[in-house]
Amino acid sequence: MDATPELKLYNTLTREKSVFSPIDPNNVRMYVCGPTVYDFAHIGNARPVIVFDVLFRLLRYVYGEDHVTYARNITDVDDKINARALRDHPGLPLNDAIRAVTEKTETQFHADVAELGCLEPNFEPRATDNIVEMTEIIEKLIGNGHAYVASGEVLFDTKSMADYGQLSKRPLDEQQAGARIAVDAHKKNPGDFVLWKLSSHNEPGWESPWGRGRPGWHIECSAMSKRYLGDVFDIHGGGLDLIFPHHENEIAQSRCAHGTEVMANVWMHNGFLQVEGRKMSKSEGNFVTIHELLQTETFGGRKWPGQVLRLAMLMTHYREPIDFSIKRLEEAERLLAKWPAAEASDAAPDESVLNALSDDLNTVAAVQALHALAQAAHGDPTARAVFAATADLLGLLPKKMEIDEAVASAVDALVAMRLEMLKAKNFTEADKIRDELTAKGIQLKDGKDAVTGERVTTWEVKR
C-alpha cells in the first residue's frame, strides 16, 4: 500500500531502530514465545500478547491479511507442569495429571486473550506435538560438532560457536547454564545447556536415540519456529527476560543446526511490568492473573473489562517498563468511556496513527491521536468511520453492547442497588457500581421523578 509510511522497528540484535524489510513481502513471518501452561497467565504475560497482536494487525494492514504468518507456541512439557500435576492431581497417573493441568490452563489462556481483543495466531503449536522435530535438530547438532552426549544427556557446546552471545552481548565467561532443567556436572563448559535430558520412571518422556527423555526448554522454540516459519524468518518476539538465556540459546541451536547467519532478522522485546511500584510476585501479595483481573474483584475491589487492560498496556511504549496500578486502569477506563461506539469500517486508518505505529510501534502517540479522532467522530459519520478503522488497527474498536433480557435485569438490579447506596449516603460503593457499568458501556443518568420527586436513575447503552 503506497500511502503506508515506512515501518521502522527496534532490533535487539543490532541495538538499532531500522527500516523493516521482510524476506518475502508475500509471506511476512513472525514467531512469539507463548505461555508455559502450568498456571493461569498473569498480567505481565498479557503484555507481549497485546504488543505483538498490535504488530500482527499492523503487518496485516501493510502487507495484506493473507501475507502474514504468525506463530505463537504453547509450552506443555516442563518441570513446573510436572510439579503442578503431582500437587493438584495426586490420584491420577502422571500423564493424565499433566493433561488435566495443561488442558485447563491452555483453555483459560485462550479465554483470557480473547477478552483482551487479540487475534488468533495462524499457528499455535504445542511442544509435545513437535518432539520428532526437536530430536532431528539435536541429531544435526551432534553430527556437526555443536552438541555432545554426557551421561545420557545431550548438551550444546557453547564454545563451538564463535559468536555465541551476540544477542545479549554477554561475554561467554559470564554466561550460565540457563536451562529450566537442572544440569549435572558433565559439561565441557560452564555455559553449556541441555538439549535433551533423561526421564525417570515417574517423569514424562519420549523415546530418542539417547534414551527415554524430554527436551530442554530452548530446543522447543527452535523446532517449532523451523517447522512453521523456516530456517530464517522475519521477526522473533518475547519479553525482555527472554533475551538470555532463552533467545540466546535458540539462536545458537538454530544457526548451528541449519548453517545460517541468523535465525530471525529482527528481535523485539517488551519491557518489564511492576504492580504499584513493586515487582509482581506471590510473596509480595500483588500477583494478579488475567482471569482474576477480568472476572474477580481481586484488583481494586472490582472486575475490569479486557479492553481497559489492553488500553492500559498500550498507553506505555512497549520497550519501556510499566508500573501497573489501579490509577492506570481508571485512566484507561475514563478514556474509553469518551469514545463513541462504532461498527467495523472499510475506511483507511488515520495517517497520524499509522505514522506513530510505523515508528517502532509508538502506541503512546497512536492512542493520543486516536483519542483526538474519537472527539471528532461524535455526530460525524465520515469521521466515525475513520475512527472505527483506526481503533480496529489497535484492537480497540468500541462495539455497541448487545443487551438481552437477563443482562438488562442484572443492570436493573445494580442500578437499584446503587440507588439504595445513595440513599444511605454510601457514595464510595455507589461510585463503584457506576464505574463498573460505565466500563461496560452503560451510561447512567440521575434525575427526579416528576410526580413523587424521588431520585430515579435511567440507563442506556453507549457502546
From Swiss-Prot:
InterPro entries, per database record: Cys-tRNA-ligase (IPR015803), Cys-tRNA/MSH_ligase (IPR024909), CysS_C (IPR056411), Rossmann-like_a/b/a_fold (IPR014729), tRNA-synt_1_cat_dom (IPR032678), tRNAsynth_Ia_anticodon-bd (IPR009080)
Cofactor remark: Binds 1 zinc ion per subunit.
GO biological process: cysteinyl-tRNA aminoacylation
Domain of life of the native organism: Bacteria
Class of this enzyme: ligase
Catalytic activity field: tRNA(Cys) + L-cysteine + ATP = L-cysteinyl-tRNA(Cys) + AMP + diphosphate
Major localization class: cytoplasm
Disulfide bonds: none
Motif ('HIGH' region): 35-45
Localization of this protein: Cytoplasm
GO molecular function, one term: ATP binding
GO cellular component term of the entry, any: cytosol
Motif 'KMSKS' region boundaries: 279-283
EC number: 6.1.1.16
Sequence positions that bind Zn(2+): C33, C221, H246, E250
Cofactors (names): Zn(2+)
Family recorded in the similarity comment: Belongs to the class-I aminoacyl-tRNA synthetase family.
Protein name (Swiss-Prot/TrEMBL): Cysteine--tRNA ligase
